[in-house]
């Protein structure tokens, strides 16, 4: 790993064992991009990679020079209105109404380590020798403002992180109308864009489409990263698949409004931009003030989509997630929501806890309905004091009774919301994130609190901190069950309104930081009606997230497959729920439900008191299996083998770091009849190591399992083999593979 600056050619070469990123200060003193991709052998001069020539009708930067036009030059952080007609990385408005600025290279710093981003989540290092950072300082002296481009390259990962800081040192105020986290200009357009799209209960489905001229974008203007689009995109060569080919991955460490887009110009170059969505964003800076953008993480892979994903997984699991629970195995839980919804009292809860303890579970989570007068979704959000009548005593007493059964105690909260039927709203109607006197949209009969306001955060924070200090809570599920609509901060001026959406999410981060710092032993799980805020920003504070409110095992195949494009198994919340399923009404075997849920944090969300002895015995087996395998599942290398978006079958596997153990999950949705013989080719094993595969009466070397594959044929397909139980539709099987 190194960052080398050549003063003569004014080039920066950022490289490690796998990647290179080369920047050049151009003739106009602005930074241009020469190369990003597979590692290049370092040399002193790469300036021949910079190409420019006359193009008819282009605007040219220098008098008497008809060759240098920003319209067809690859740039690091392109501005608005200076000859580049593509979408800019930032736009500034001056007091005189001008949007024309010219930031040029002033100086730079190269140092070991990685700086923290004030008030924002970001990847980190545990020692300075893990990474090097370049701070590239640009200045427009005419407006007394600097832009600092931050680049960090890791030693152990094919990763570069980027963010931008604006610093104003002028008596003139400037207003940021747009401030993206990074821009990447690529030489050609021969890529396919991959993104993760969906809606409630159908999150992060994989989409892949060829780049074309113009702009293709994904975004959120909902106040959270959203179900609709995850803050991630990848550009893959057309021949790239899960196992081979060139892939660029881009992920934004942010939980609010975002924009991620590709733009192909008529010279066939592709531009990637990612950052805070400019719609509704307007940030004014006065003298001595600064603005920091969120971090964008860039991953390069020569080993296809699995290679990209494995880098994201390890980076996010070990250098984004933090705290006590980063490396600890996660407890097997029972959640009360789909067991009782709002219809519970203390005897019901204690009965469920008895059943959970008897089956070997470790954590009891009391979901919605324990506070205020909360017997349905119409009241009491914001009134974070226990309903002692409903609980037949204090919450502390209930938690201690559950602890006495050998279970940890967890709690559901939704700090950012209120109902009109609540003590909070009656006392502070001006705390809603909406203009008083105007019609306000409701969703789930609730409303958003203005977390841009310090007094709101402190009020909610004090209530929750006092609660957690009193009650022996080991787990918190932090929910957010609606998105923004009418955004307005009461009592603040016009200039403030353009800052509200970003200040809101900074406020959420602040409260997360307060609570996780005060209670480091508590495991936090993020949630937003399922997966509406399942993003890297949340992972910085909560090492696991509720992946989707859809707990149906068959629907979860696509949801968890897509989620794994970016996020490690250790953060994917997954539960075994009731059959028929509460979202789809689908009936599936309890074995299948567990075989899907194993590949996540794992838990149960159903009424255990209604189970028969056969199901209870199966759950005991499942829990014993998970306790034995969860260290491998949480920390192993994950491979996607067969996509649910391409056929009737899904498969994935996890391999231990030493390649001595693996688990393979195989799923078939519908039972075919009289089809051909099936093989599943594995990955990540040692070719010359002999392995025992569960369900087979013979051993196989790794090369056979990877080149020929496991036999998956069953009796309904015309031949019996021991690998797969014949279950008909919704078949699943988890294979254990162990080195002999």
Task: For each feature predicted by the language model, list its residue ranges.
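Carbohydrate-binding surface patches
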Residues: 242, 644-686
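Active-site neighborhood of glycoside hydrolase catalytic domains
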Residues: 392-394, 426-428, 432-587, 601, ...
